[in-house]
A protein has these predicted regions:
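Active-site phosphate-binding strand-loop segment of PLP-dependent enzymes
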Residues: 1-11
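Short gly/Ser/Thr-rich phosphate-binding loop of adenylate-forming enzymes
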Residues: 14
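Short glycine-enriched loop/turn motifs at secondary-structure junctions
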Residues: 2, 31-32, 63-66, 114, ...
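Structural motif
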Residues: 9, 38, 71, 165-167, ...
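Short, structured coil segments at secondary-structure junctions
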Residues: 3-4, 23-24, 208-209
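Generic beta-sheet signal
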Residues: 11, 30, 73, 215-216
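ALDH superfamily catalytic-core signature
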Residues: 17-151
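Conserved C-terminal structural/oligomerization subdomain of aldehyde/semialdehyde dehydrogenase
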Residues: 136-221
Length: 221
């Protein structure tokens, strides 16, 4: 409210943004995000895996630009997962994923509803989450808990803000790109793609229309 402050730059969640908007000053504020990353069959898979783990695990995924869900073309999905495991991701089994979801998601997201994570797990280490939510011991330096799910799963639609990364398979890159638009909820915040196909790179950039769009790199670069 200081008289010499004419503009507020705010991030940190809807509560903080709402408070800033009530100050009767100009406001630049960051909105919600659920950044998808698409990986197609032309991508450099080892590099894509390294970049995704690096980006999605940055500050335990609490940063809103971090990769939140992986949408991968079926033909390279297994290779991508194997490469991600080389960089500190630990894949969970289906039963573990469902137990984890019930614990770390307070309000399951879906099409048209962004949902909400359980704040008790936001920003926690992957090893802590595995231990507390599943009673599972994983290496303390685990960077991500990798969860292969179907495309309608709440983990795809909910911004977790923790090192829990859902992955879903798609028949084609175009199908994955179209789904990326949906699960990002139209926030137009952040999205990324790993591909050597220029037409796909351009198409995703246009249809996502995000403030931040990354091609063949991690979102924090």
């Amino acid at each position: 409210d200081h008289a010499m402050v004419s503009i507020l730059v705010v991030t940190g969640g809807p509560g903080v943004v709402r408070a800033a908007m009530q100050r009767h000053k100009k406001v630049i504020a960051a909105g919600p995000g659920n950044p998808p990353v698409v990986v197609d069959e032309t991508a450099d898979i080892p590099k894509a895996a390294k970049d995704i783990v690096a980006g999605a695990s940055l500050d335990n995924n609490i940063i809103c630009i971090d990769e939140k869900e992986v949408l991968v073309v079926e033909s390279v999905a297994d290779q991508l997962k194997a490469e991600m495991e080389k960089h500190g991701a630990v894949e969970l089994a289906s039963e573990q994923i469902e137990r984890l979801t019930k614990t770390v998601i307070a309000d399951p997201g879906r099409r048209g509803h962004e949902g909400m994570a359980n704040k008790a797990f936001v920003g926690k280490d992957a090893a802590y989450i595995a231990r507390e939510a599943l009673g599972l011991a994983v290496p303390e330096d685990t960077r991500l808990l990798l969860c292969e799910v179907d495309r309608g799963h709440p983990l795809i639609w909910t911004e977790q803000l923790m090192p829990v990364l859902p992955l879903a398979r798609f028949s084609t890159a175009d199908e994955a790109i179209d789904y990326a638009v949906e699960c990002e909820h139209g926030f137009r915040h952040t999205a990324s793609i790993h591909s050597k196909n220029v037409e796909r790179l351009s198409r995703m950039a246009k249809v996502m229309n995000c403030s931040l769009f990354v091609k063949n790199g991690s979102n924090y670069n």
